């Protein structure tokens, strides 16, 4: 797969404790992205954040939170991202949890598999 020039960065904000059954929402998203042959995806774990509920989630040594902020970043062409957004929305519906989905244009400068 080749990816260069103008592409879309899709960000999905969720919580570490958000699951569908025993699988974390972020893992459901990553697996779905791989099944749809998305160019790439990364899960980032935040140290502090809040969302629509305004509840602050934090990682402190004294009180280790089990619900830290999670951001899934996905990059691919505009068409593939637009086709993938309903998949993410369905995952959120199944989890019965809230979240946030954003997109922005990015310029891919380098994207090559291992040799």
Show the residue positions of the predicted features.
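Positively charged, small/polar-rich N-terminal and surface patches that mediate targeting and assembly
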Residues: 1-115
């Amino acid at each position: 797969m080749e990816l260069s020039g103008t592409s879309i960065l899709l960000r999905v904000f969720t919580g570490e404790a958000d699951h569908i059954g025993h699988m974390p929402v972020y893992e459901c998203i990553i697996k779905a992205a791989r099944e749809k042959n998305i160019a790439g995806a990364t899960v980032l774990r935040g140290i502090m954040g809040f969302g629509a509920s305004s509840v602050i989630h934090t990682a402190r040594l004294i009180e280790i939170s089990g619900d830290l902020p999670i951001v899934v970043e996905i990059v691919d062409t505009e068409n593939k991202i637009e086709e993938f957004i309903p998949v993410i929305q369905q995952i959120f519906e199944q989890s019965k949890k809230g979240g946030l989905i954003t997109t922005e244009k990015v310029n891919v400068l380098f994207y090559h598999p291992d040799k």
